[in-house]
Amino acid sequence: MQPAASPDAATSGAARRLRVLVIAEAANPEWVSVPLVGWSIATALRAHHDVHVVTQIRNRDAFLRAGLVEGRDFTAIDSEAVARPIWRLAEILRMGKGKGWTMVTALSSKLAYPYFERKLWQEFGPRIAAGEFDIVHRVTPLTPTANSLIAPRCRKAGVPFVMGPLNGGVPWPKGFDAERRREREWLSYVRGLYRLSLSRRRMIRAASAIIAGSRHTASEFATASDRLTLIPENGIDPARFSLRAEQPGTLPLRCAFVGRLVPYKGPDMLIEAAEPFLRDGSMVLDILGDGPLMPVLQEMIAGRGLTQAVTLHGWIDHREVQGLLSQSQLLTFPSVREFGGGVVLEAMALGVVPVIADYAGPGELVTPDTGVTVPMGTRAEVVAGFRAALARLVAAPDTIPTLAATALARVEAHFTWDRKARQIGAIYDWVLDPKGPIPQPVPLAGE
C-alpha cells in the first residue's frame, strides 16, 4: 500500500452526495455476522449518499420490515434456483453443523454468487452503462475468494467499481492442526489456489479501489497496492451498544467469553488458563454462546469444581448481549483464528477491556492502551500466556478503568458505522479524483 493520506482528509467522508449502487448479497438487520455487516454498512452509507442496495431475495422481508421501499431503496434478486441447492450441498459436505466454513464459503462464492451477479447485471447493466450511478460498490460477499464478474463491465462503462471491506481465510496458526481437523476445515489446506483464477486477476485489474478488512487480506491483493486501503469490516451501532460497564478497579473481576463454542475460539483454553483465579475467588466467568463444545465445557467445569465460578448462559440473542457483557470488566477471548473480531469492538464500546490472542483481526483492533494481547503460540503457550495476563490484571485491577476508557474512545473515534461510512466516502472521493495516495483512514494496532 502507498503511504497514508492525512488522517483528517481520510476520515472526513465524501465531499458530495453520490449515486451509489451497493451490492450486498448478504445483508440482513435481523441476523448476525456477515449479513449484519452488509446491512450496517449499506445503511450507514445511506445517510451520506443516494444509495440503492441490491441484495438476495432471502433478505427482502427483513428489508421491508425495516421500512425500506422496494424498487426505490433496494432490489431483491431471486437467485434461489442456484443458491438453494448449493446451500443444501454445502450442509452435506461440511460434515457437521457449524463446521467446515471454508467449504460453505467456497461453494457459495464459486457457484451461487456468480449466478447472483449475472442476474444483477441483467437488471442493472443498462442502467450502469447509462450513467445512472457514480459508483458501484460491492460490500458483500465479504470473502476475498468471491470474484466479481461485473467489475470489468463497470470499468468498460466508465463507472468506478469498489470492493470491500474484504476479509476472511486467515491461516490456521501453527500448533492448532488438531483444532483445524475438528472444525472439518479440510479445504483450508488448498484455499490459496483461488489466487490463480484468471477471473480474479481481471477483477483486480478492473477495480478502482479495494478495501481490505485486515492486513492478511491486504497481503492477498499486493498487486493492487496503489488502489488498496485498510478498513476493518466490523463496526458499532451506538444505539445497540449504549450501556457502560462499571469499572471499580477492584476484585473479584467479572470476565466474559462471547461466541460460538467451537475449538478455534478456545473457551476450553480460557477455563484452563483462568482456573487458579476462578478457584480462589478473584475472578468469575460468564460464557455466552452455544456450540459443539458445550458438553465438553460442562464436564470440564464440573470435574474441576468450578460450578460456582463459571456460568454457561447458552445462546443469547445479539440484541441482549450488551446487557450481559456490560456487567463484566474483561472480555477474555482466546480465539486463534478470528478474521474480524466484531465482539472485541462490542466489548470496547461498552467499556469492557479485551484480553485477546494477538493474531489476525482482534490483534489489529486492540492497542496496548486499550487492552491486553497474548502472543500466539502453541495451545500450551496460549494457555500459559492468558494465565500470565490474567494474573497481572488480578494483581493490579486498578489499571483496568483507564484501559476501558481508552478502548471506548478508540471505538468512538474510528469504529462506529457512521465513521465507517465517512471513511468509505473518502475512498469514493479518491476513486473519482485519484490525486495522491489512496486514503488510509483507520490506524490499526502496531502502526
Label each residue range with its predicted role.
Residues V353-A357:
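Short hydrophobic beta-strand element within catalytic cores of glycosyltransferases
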Residues L36, L253, F257-P276, P292-Q298:
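A conserved mid-protein helix/loop that constitutes part of the nucleotide-sugar donor-binding site
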Residues M1-I77, K156-V159, G436, V442-E447:
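N-terminal subdomain of nucleotide-sugar transferases
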Residues A14, E25, R84-S108, R155-L198:
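Acceptor-binding helix/loop patch of EC 2.4 sugar-transfer enzymes
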